[in-house]
């Protein structure tokens, strides 16, 4: 191959991005959602978020959901009970895409001291912002969004517009 061809391939490879896929379960019942307090993760420790895990190699998103439900929430779910609620692309440079999934039924009951049920209209103030935004977007019927909203300038644009978060405590 010519040197020019090698350069073109190298340039193309440089622009490829490795994507981290997060799978986030929205376990809801009677207007409440199960949230876990993060601990020992190195990011957002002490903040609440729904049960979350990363897509593993050779695993489907639904298989990840089943694994996360068991490992993070202590419940068993069936593939047929999992539905797509929202997809969020992080445009801050982290290379993350999050699939927020609703689960229509499960077996078992989560009893860990780091988890609590919260009313969707009364979420904790110390909740990870991306989850709060995704829940708001899902409630408004949006199925896809970027985070931060509108890219890195999003929070300032939202404040300037007088935006109010429907899920704020």
Residue ranges of each PLM-predicted region?
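A cytosolic small-molecule/anion-sensing beta-strand core signal
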Residues: 29
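Residue-level preference for beta-strand/loop junctions
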Residues: 17-19, 44, 95
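Conserved Nudix-box catalytic region and its N-terminal flanking loop in Nudix hydrolases
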Residues: 32-71
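Active-site segment of metal-dependent pyrophosphate-handling enzymes
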Residues: 74-109
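Short hydrophobic/aromatic beta-strand or adjacent loop that forms the aromatic wall/cage
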Residues: 20-24, 96-100, 132
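Conserved hydrophobic/aromatic beta-strand scaffold that supports enzyme active sites
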Residues: 35, 100-102, 115-117
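Nudix hydrolase/Nudix homology domain
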Residues: 45, 113-169
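Acidic, metal-coordinating catalytic segment for phosphate/diphosphate chemistry
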Residues: 1-24
């Amino acid at each position: 191959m010519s040197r020019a061809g090698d350069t073109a391939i190298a340039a193309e490879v440089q622009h490829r991005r490795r994507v981290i896929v997060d799978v986030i379960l929205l376990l809801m019942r009677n207007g409440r959602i199960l949230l876990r307090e993060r601990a020992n993760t190195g990011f957002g420790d002490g903040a609440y978020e729904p049960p979350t895990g990363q897509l593993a190699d050779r695993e489907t998103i639904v298989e990840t959901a089943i694994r996360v439900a068991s490992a993070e929430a202590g419940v068993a779910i069936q593939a047929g009970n999992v539905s797509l609620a929202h997809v969020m692309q992080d445009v801050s440079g982290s290379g993350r895409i999050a699939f927020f999934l609703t689960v229509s039924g499960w077996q078992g009951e989560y009893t860990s001291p780091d988890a609590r049920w919260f009313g969707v209209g009364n979420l904790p103030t110390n909740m990870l912002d991306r989850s709060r935004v995704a829940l708001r977007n899902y409630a408004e019927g949006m199925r896809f969004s970027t985070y931060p909203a509108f890219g890195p300038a999003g929070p300032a644009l939202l404040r300037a517009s007088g935006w109010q978060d429907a899920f704020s405590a």
